[in-house]
């Protein structure tokens, strides 16, 4: 089973901007509701394959996308990744 990571945002504008940038980079993403266990100012999150983490991080930093954090799922909860 492929592992997916989750990006949480503080604003819908930043979530939609990230969606556009990641799709343009041909990264497989899924726009989804922010899980209850993740504190964020926006109800939208983006899931992406863990194998694309380095490229996603590069795009976020280069394009100065404001995010709350990137999370991985451990058992039934989400854990924030360190930068």
How would you name each of these model-derived features?
Residues 50-83:
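C-terminal structural segments of small proteins and small subunits
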Residues 6, 12, 16, 21-23, ...:
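Amphipathic, hydrophobic secondary-structure cores in small proteins
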Residues 11-15, 19, 66, 81-83:
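Short N-terminal helix-initiation segments at or just after the protein's N-terminus
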């Amino acid at each position: 089973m492929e592992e997916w990571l989750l990006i949480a945002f503080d604003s819908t504008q930043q979530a939609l901007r990230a969606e556009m940038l990641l799709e343009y980079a041909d990264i497989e993403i899924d726009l989804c509701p922010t899980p209850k266990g993740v504190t964020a100012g926006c109800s939208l999150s983006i899931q992406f394959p863990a194998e694309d983490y380095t490229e996603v991080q590069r795009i976020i930093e280069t394009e100065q996308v404001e995010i709350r954090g990137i999370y991985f799922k451990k058992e039934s909860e989400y854990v924030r990744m360190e930068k």
